């Protein structure tokens, strides 16, 4: 994550004092303004299974599908995040600075996950079970990734804010914090959430497509060939 604005939005009181002494402003700030607080929540919203769309419809729903492949099943969701910022501010006219005790609340979630299995596959059949099992791997990747993002973001927040007030030129503290969140934290968290797509792509490997084409005594392959003929 880009470390922006730190030259202006100071994260340590040492900029205002000698190595081992607090200035009166530092003492007043640190003793009275309150604690810096960061809070993070992460949750998934569950999943559902949809068996109403054909493999051709699912293929159209998925971008960048190889021309010779059909999408037999599809797992869809959307990463969501929100960051709320509030702050207590204490000014010091003598120095022309202010100290800020931010409260940062981060919420991470996925939209309800929908697992699609092509309507050509009847529930209870071997082919349906194989396609569903493949999609459940995608579901697991999403559900396993969210706690990892939570852990990484929580550690980064703790390191950045360290339960210490921040210092800035008078009247600029909150605006600088908002800028840091918008240009630093939001892209950082978005990337962390988006890293799961590399895992999803690895699940849809050529080897996995080849395996699925051979399962259930060729039942899946016969459906694929039928749809290829219909497309031509």
Which residues does each PLM region occupy?
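Positively charged n-region of N-terminal signal peptides that target proteins for export
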Residues: 1-4
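Metalloprotease/metallohydrolase-associated module, dominated by Zn2+-dependent proteases
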Residues: 37-39, 43-45, 49-107, 113-119, ...
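Boundary at the C-terminal end of the N-terminal hydrophobic targeting segment
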Residues: 17-21
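N-terminal membrane-targeting hydrophobic helices
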Residues: 23-34, 38-44
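Bacterial N-terminal signal peptides
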Residues: 6-15
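Active-site alpha-helix of zinc metalloproteases
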Residues: 125-130, 139
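Catalytic Zn2+-binding segment of zinc metalloproteases
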Residues: 136-153
């Amino acid at each position: 994550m880009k470390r922006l604005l730190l030259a202006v939005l100071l994260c340590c009181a040492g900029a205002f004092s000698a190595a081992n002494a607090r200035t009166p402003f530092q003492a007043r700030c640190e003793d009275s303004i309150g604690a810096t607080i960061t809070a993070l929540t992460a949750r998934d919203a569950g999943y559902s299974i949809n068996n109403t769309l054909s493999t051709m419809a699912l293929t159209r729903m998925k971008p960048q599908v190889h021309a010779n492949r059909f999408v037999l099943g599809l797992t869809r969701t959307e990463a969501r995040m929100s960051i709320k910022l509030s702050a207590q501010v204490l000014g010091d006219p003598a120095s022309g600075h202010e100290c800020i005790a931010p409260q940062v609340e981060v919420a991470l979630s996925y939209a309800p996950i929908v697992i699609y299995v092509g309507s050509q596959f009847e529930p209870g059949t071997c082919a349906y079970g194989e396609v569903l099992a493949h999609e459940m791997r995608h579901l697991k990747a999403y559900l396993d990734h969210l706690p990892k993002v939570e852990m990484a973001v929580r550690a980064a927040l703790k390191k950045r804010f360290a339960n210490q007030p921040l210092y800035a030129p008078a009247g600029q503290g909150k605006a600088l914090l908002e800028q840091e969140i918008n240009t630093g934290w939001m892209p950082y968290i978005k990337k962390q959430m988006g890293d799961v797509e590399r895992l999803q792509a690895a699940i849809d490997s050529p080897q996995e497509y080849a395996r699925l084409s051979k399962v259930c005594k060729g039942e899946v392959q016969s459906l694929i060939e039928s749809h290829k003929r219909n497309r031509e």
